[in-house]
C-alpha cells in the first residue's frame, strides 16, 4: 500500500497540470482514510515534493496538502508542527530562499498559499495555536497584506521601492545631461533655422515687401487725377492747388529739401491735405470757407465731365467696348525652384542647413522630448524642446514644399589619362644644348650598364613584337630611363635582362625535342633512382674525395693562403665511395581482425597487426568474441574484476536516483553508465517527467540565438585564426623594434 501511495503522489505532483486529476486524488483520499500510518507516510512524501526545486511540483503538492488539511486532524497536527518550514517553501518567508522557477507558477502558488493560510486561520485558528501564531507572524512581522491581490511581502515592497528609486536617479542624471546638451545646441539650432529662413526669403521673396500703395483710396485717387491733368480747365485748379500746397508746405515742413524729390511735382490729394492741415488753416474765416466750397464744387463738376470724356477716349483708343470685362487666370499652385548660376550658393547653404537639421538636430530634439516625457518632468526644458521641434518641422515642411531641383554634383577624380595629358604638355619643350642622351660604349660600364647588343659580334638582334600595343613613352620618361642616377634606368636594365633570359631559355629547352627524340623516349622509360656522389662520378677519378683543408692558424689574416694544407681522410673517402642498399623483404598484409566485443553487441573490425588502440593486444577469438586460449580468458576476467573493484559502491545509478528524489540534490546519476543495451534506456531516463517544464532548456530569445551563432565552435576558431594571423604579421613586421614588441 505504501508503494501505491508513493506512485499516486508522484503521478499527481509531476503531472504539470494546474488542477489535480480527480480520479487519482479520490483514490489517494480513500487510501489515507483507511489508516493513520498512511496519513503519516503521505505527509512525509508531500514534504519531500515541496522541497523539490520546481514550482509546478510544489504547486501540485500544495493542492494535495489543502485537500488533506481540510479532512484529517492528524494531518493538520503534523503540518502545523512544522508550519515554519511549510511557509518558507510556499509563501517565501525567507528571502534568502526564493521560490524555484518557473516564475509565473511560483507567483501563483504564493498567492494561493496566502489565501489558504487566511482561510485556515478563520476556520481552525481557535483550535490550533501555532496556526494562529503563524498567521499573525505573516501579518505583523512579514507585513503581508492579506487583502492585497498581489500579496507582496515587506522584502518585495522594499525591492520595488529600491528599484523605483534607482530608476528615478538614473532619469535625473539623464535629464540633467539632456538639459545641458540642449542648452549647448539650442544656439546652433536657432542659427540653422535663421539661415534656412534667410535662404527661403532670397529664393522666394514675400510679395508684401514690394507693395507700392499701402491704401486702396490712394491708388483710386491717383488713377482719377491722371486723366484730369490733360483737361483745359486744369490750369485754374492747378494754380489753386499749387498755392494751397505752398502754404501747407511752409507750415508742415521746415525745409522743402526734406520732402522726396519724386513727390514734389505731384498734385496734392484732398484727403492728405485736410489731414495734414495745421492750426493756422483751421482758424480761417467762414467766408473764405464758403468761397472755397463754391470754387471746389465748380471744379469738381468740370473734372467729372472731363473724366467721363477721357474714359470714353481711353476705350476708343484701345479698341475696348466697355469696362465690364471679367478675366479668369489659372495660377499654378505647384512650386518648383530650379538651380541656376544665380542661386547656386544659396541652394548649397540651404541644403547644408537642411541636412544638419534633419540628421543631427531633429533626432536629438526627439530624444530630449522622449526622455523628458519618461522622466515625468513638466519643466521649461520640455516646453522649449517642443517649441524647437515645431520650428524644425515647419522649416522641413517648407523645404519639402519648395520642391528644389538641384543639379547632381559630380566629383572629379584624377586618372592616369590626366597625368598623361600633363606629361604631353612637356613634349614640345626643346632639348638643352650639349645634352647627349646616348651614352658611348666605353662609358656604359662606368655607369653600371651592359654593353650594347648591336656591337657584340656573333649575335643577331631579334625583333620582338609585343602582343599588347604599348603606349608611346613621353620625353620625360625617356630622359629618366637614360639618366643612370634615376630609378627608371635601373628598372629598364632589369627588364632588359629578363627579356634576354626568357627567349634564350625557351630556345635551349626546345632544341632537344627537335634534335634528340630518341633520347627523350629513353629518358621517359628509364627508372628513376636517388643519385649519390658515387653514381655522379661513376667510373671517374675523384681528386677531391676524402681531402680536407687544415689550417695551422685559426687567425683570419696572420697566416697567408699558401700555408693551408690538405689532409686526406680515409673515413671520408670511404663514405663517398660506399653505397648502402636496403632490402626490407616482402610485405605481408594483415588478414586477422580484433574481434573484441563492443558495447552495442557487435565485434571490433579493426585490422591492426599487433595491438588494437581500444582493446589492447590482439588475441585469437571465436565467432562471438570470446578468446580461444584459456590464458587470455583468465586475463580479461581478472582485468574486468579489478575495474569493477575500483568503482565505489555508492555510485550505483539506481541508488543515486533514489537519493536524488529524496533530497532534491543532483548527484550525477545521469552521467553514470546505464545497464542495458541500446540508447532507449538513457532516452527514457531523460524524459522521465515529460509533462513538467524543462528548466534546463534555454529560452528562445534573440540573445540566445546570437550566443549560439557568435560562440559557435567554428566561429570561434575562425576568429582565433584571424587574430593569430594578425599577430603573426605584426610580429614579422615589427619584430626588431622594441617599442612595438612591448605593446
Curated annotation (Swiss-Prot):
Start-end of Acidic residues biased regions: 417-428
Chain segments carrying region Disordered: 221-310, 413-482, 500-525
Top-level taxon of the source organism: Eukaryota
Pfam family, one: UVSSA_N
Zinc finger (UVSSA-type): 591-618
Single Gene Ontology MF annotation: RNA polymerase II complex binding
Gene Ontology biological process: protein ubiquitination; response to UV; transcription-coupled nucleotide-excision repair
Post-translational modification as stated in the protein's UniProt record: Monoubiquitinated at Lys-432 in response to transcription stress; this promotes efficient transfer of TFIIH to stalled RNA polymerase II.
Record's compositionally biased regions (Low complexity): 226-252
InterPro entries for this protein: ENTH_VHS, UVSSA, UVSSA_C, UVSSA_N_a-solenoid_rpt
Gene name per UniProt: uvssa
UniProt biased composition (Basic and acidic residues): 283-300, 429-447, 510-522
Sequence similarity: Belongs to the UVSSA family.
Functional summary from the UniProt entry: Factor involved in transcription-coupled nucleotide excision repair (TC-NER), a mechanism that rapidly removes RNA polymerase II-blocking lesions from the transcribed strand of active genes. Acts as a key adapter that promotes recruitment of factors involved in TC-NER. Facilitates the ubiquitination of the elongating form of RNA polymerase II (RNA pol IIo) at DNA damage sites, thereby promoting RNA pol IIo backtracking and access by the TC-NER machinery to lesion sites.
Gene3D superfamilies: 1.25.40.90
Keywords: Chromosome, Coiled coil, DNA damage, DNA repair, Isopeptide bond, Metal-binding, Ubl conjugation, Zinc, Zinc-finger
Subcellular location: Chromosome
Region (VHS-like): 2-145
Protein name, entry field: UV-stimulated scaffold protein A
GO cellular component: chromosome; nucleus; site of DNA damage
Covalent link (Glycyl lysine isopeptide (Lys-Gly) (interchain with G-Cter in ubiquitin)) residue numbers: 432
Classification lineage: Eukaryota, Metazoa, Chordata, Craniata, Vertebrata
Signal peptide region: none
Amino acid at each position: 500500500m505504501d508503494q501505491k501511495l508513493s506512485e499516486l503522489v508522484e503521478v499527481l505532483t509531476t503531472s504539470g497540470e494546474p488542477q489535480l486529476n480527480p480520479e487519482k486524488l479520490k483514490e489517494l483520499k480513500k487510501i489515507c482514510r483507511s489508516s493513520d500510518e498512511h496519513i503519516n507516510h503521505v505527509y512525509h512524501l508531500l514534504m519531500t515534493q515541496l522541497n523539490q526545486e520546481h514550482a509546478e511540483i510544489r504547486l501540485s503538492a500544495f493542492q494535495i496538502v489543502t485537500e488533506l488539511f481540510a479532512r484529517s486532524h492528524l494531518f493538520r497536527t503534523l503540518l502545523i508542527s512544522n508550519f515554519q518550514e511549510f511557509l518558507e517553501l510556499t509563501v517565501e518567508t525567507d528571502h534568502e530562499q526564493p521560490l524555484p522557477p518557473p516564475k509565473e507558477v511560483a507567483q501563483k502558488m504564493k498567492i494561493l498559499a496566502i489565501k489558504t493560510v487566511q482561510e485556515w486561520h478563520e476556520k481552525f485558528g481557535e483550535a490550533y495555536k501555532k496556526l494562529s501564531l503563524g498567521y499573525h507572524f505573516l501579518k505583523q512581522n512579514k507585513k503581508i497584506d492579506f487583502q492585497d491581490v498581489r500579496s507582496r511581502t515587506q522584502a518585495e515592497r522594499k525591492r520595488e521601492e529600491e528599484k523605483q528609486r534607482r530608476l528615478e536617479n538614473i532619469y535625473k542624471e539623464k535629464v540633467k545631461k539632456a538639459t545641458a546638451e540642449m542648452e549647448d545646441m539650442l544656439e546652433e539650432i536657432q542659427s540653422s533655422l535663421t539661415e534656412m529662413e534667410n535662404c527661403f526669403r532670397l529664393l522666394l521673396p514675400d510679395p508684401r515687401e514690394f507693395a507700392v500703395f499701402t491704401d486702396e483710396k490712394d491708388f483710386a485717387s491717383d488713377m482719377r487725377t491722371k486723366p484730369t491733368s490733360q483737361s483745359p480747365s486744369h490750369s485754374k485748379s492747378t494754380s489753386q492747388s499749387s498755392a494751397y500746397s505752398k502754404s501747407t508746405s511752409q507750415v508742415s515742413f521746415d525745409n522743402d529739401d526734406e520732402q522726396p524729390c519724386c513727390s514734389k511735382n505731384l498734385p496734392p490729394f484732398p484727403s492728405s491735405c485736410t489731414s495734414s492741415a495745421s492750426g493756422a488753416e483751421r482758424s480761417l474765416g467762414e467766408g473764405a470757407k464758403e468761397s472755397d466750397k463754391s470754387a471746389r464744387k465748380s471744379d469738381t463738376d468740370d473734372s467729372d465731365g472731363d473724366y467721363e470724356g477721357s474714359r470714353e477716349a481711353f476705350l476708343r483708343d484701345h479698341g475696348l467696348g466697355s469696362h465690364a470685362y471679367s478675366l479668369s487666370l489659372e495660377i499654378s499652385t505647384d512650386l518648383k525652384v530650379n538651380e541656376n548660376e544665380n542661386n547656386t550658393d544659396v541652394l548649397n547653404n540651404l541644403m547644408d542647413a537642411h541636412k544638419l537639421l534633419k540628421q543631427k538636430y531633429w533626432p536629438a530634439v526627439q530624444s530630449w522630448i522622449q526622455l523628458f516625457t519618461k522622466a515625468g518632468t513638466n519643466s521649461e526644458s520640455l516646453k522649449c524642446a517642443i517649441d524647437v521641434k515645431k520650428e524644425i518641422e515647419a522649416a522641413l515642411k517648407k523645404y519639402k514644399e519648395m520642391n528644389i531641383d538641384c543639379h547632381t554634383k559630380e566629383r572629379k577624380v584624377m586618372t592616369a589619362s590626366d597625368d598623361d595629358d600633363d606629361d604631353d604638355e612637356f613634349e614640345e619643350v626643346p632639348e638643352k644644348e650639349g645634352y647627349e642622351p646616348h651614352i658611348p660604349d666605353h662609358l656604359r660600364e662606368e655607369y653600371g650598364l651592359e654593353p650594347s647588343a648591336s656591337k657584340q659580334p656573333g649575335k643577331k638582334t631579334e625583333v620582338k613584337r609585343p602582343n599588347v600595343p604599348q603606349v608611346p613613352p613621353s620625353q620625360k620618361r625617356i630622359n629618366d630611363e637614360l639618366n643612370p642616377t634615376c630609378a627608371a634606368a635601373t628598372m629598364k636594365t632589369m627588364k632588359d635582362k629578363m627579356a634576354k633570359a626568357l627567349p634564350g631559355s625557351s630556345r635551349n629547352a626546345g632544341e632537344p625535342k627537335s634534335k634528340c627524340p630518341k633520347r627523350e623516349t629513353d629518358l621517359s622509360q628509364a627508372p628513376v633512382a636517388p643519385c649519390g656522389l658515387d653514381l655522379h662520378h661513376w667510373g671517374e677519378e675523384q681528386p677531391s674525395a676524402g681531402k680536407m683543408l687544415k689550417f695551422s692558424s685559426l687567425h683570419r689574416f696572420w697566416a697567408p693562403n699558401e700555408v693551408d694544407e690538405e689532409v686526406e681522410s680515409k673515413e671520408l673517402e670511404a663514405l663517398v665511395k660506399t653505397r648502402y642498399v636496403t632490402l626490407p623483404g616482402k610485405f605481408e598484409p594483415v588478414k586477422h581482425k580484433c574481434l573484441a566485443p563492443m558495447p552495442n553487441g557487435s565485434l571490433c573490425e579493426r585490422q591492426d597487426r599487433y595491438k588494437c588502440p581500444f582493446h589492447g593486444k590482439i588475441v585469437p577469438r571465436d565467432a562471438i568474441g570470446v578468446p580461444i586460449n584459456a590464458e587470455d580468458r583468465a586475463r580479461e576476467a581478472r582485468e574486468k574484476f579489478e575495474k569493477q573493484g575500483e568503482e565505489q559502491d555508492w555510485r550505483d545509478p539506481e541508488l543515486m536516483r533514489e537519493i536524488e528524489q529524496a533530497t532534491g540534490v543532483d548527484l550525477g546519476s545521469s552521467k553514470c553508465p546505464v545497464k542495458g543495451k541500446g540508447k532507449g534506456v538513457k532516452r527514457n531516463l531523460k524524459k522521465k517527467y515529460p509533462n513538467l517544464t524543462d528548466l534546463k532548456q534555454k529560452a528562445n530569445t534573440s540573445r540566445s540565438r546570437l550566443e549560439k551563432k557568435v560562440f559557435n565552435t567554428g566561429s570561434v576558431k575562425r576568429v582565433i585564426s584571424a587574430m593569430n594571423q594578425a599577430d603573426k604579421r605584426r610580429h614579422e613586421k615589427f619584430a626588431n623594434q622594441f617599442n612595438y614588441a612591448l605593446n
